[in-house]
């Protein structure tokens, strides 16, 4: 018989290491849901599943390129694709974002604005007002694309880093994210 610690480690290993992507609608999400359902049923739990339509999304290689550097980046889950050239504006606080002249620019987002993942704008279960405000400011900024330099101090201990700040199929501004270390280049 396995100890509780061994059992928990087995489940977490499968859900976090074996399945790398659990974004809603992805093959990994469906595999994780099936695995969880099987574990509950094996322990004689009665379950109900509520099905809903969700689209799958896959990212190709993403990068940020200037005349002098080329940086590998990660596409934000569900991001629209893009290939563009534009001037850059940089913001790190809500106040700077409110005052930014970002129309038709690529907005580099760092600091306070890149320390936590923002809830999807139409997520009804939990969506703090400050997240709604930031998303709204991005959408009304006129920015052509967003580059998030993810704040390492915002990463959860032992969690994914860098992590996507935006993971929202309803958010239509193309975005990528990179680590602070990559952003220093």
Regions found by a protein language model. Give the residues of each.
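Noncatalytic luminal/extracellular "stalk/propeptide" segments of secretory-pathway proteins
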Residues: 2, 6, 10-118
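Extracellular/luminal Protease-associated
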Residues: 73-167, 172-174
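Conserved active-site and cofactor/substrate-binding residues in soluble primary-metabolism enzymes
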Residues: 10, 31, 47, 129, ...
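Long, well-ordered, tryptophan-enriched scaffold segments
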Residues: 173-185
């Amino acid at each position: 018989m396995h100890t509780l610690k061994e059992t928990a480690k087995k489940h977490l290993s499968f859900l976090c290491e074996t399945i790398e992507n659990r974004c809603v609608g992805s093959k990994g999400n469906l595999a994780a849901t099936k695995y969880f359902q099987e574990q509950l049923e094996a322990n004689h739990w009665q379950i109900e599943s509520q099905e809903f339509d969700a689209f799958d999304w896959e990212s190709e290689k993403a990068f940020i390129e200037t005349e002098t550097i080329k940086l590998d980046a990660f596409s934000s889950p569900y991001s629209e694709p893009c290939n563009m050239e534009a001037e850059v504006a940089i913001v790190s606080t809500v106040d700077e974002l409110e005052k930014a002249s970002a129309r038709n620019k690529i907005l580099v987002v760092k600091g306070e604005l890149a320390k936590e993942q923002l809830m999807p704008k139409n997520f009804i279960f939990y969506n703090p007002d400050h997240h709604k405000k930031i998303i709204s400011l991005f959408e009304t900024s006129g920015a052509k694309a967003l580059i998030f330099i993810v704040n390492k101090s915002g990463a959860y201990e032992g969690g994914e880093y860098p992590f996507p700040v935006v993971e929202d199929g309803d958010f239509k501004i193309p975005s990528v994210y990179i680590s602070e270390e990559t952003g220093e280049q």
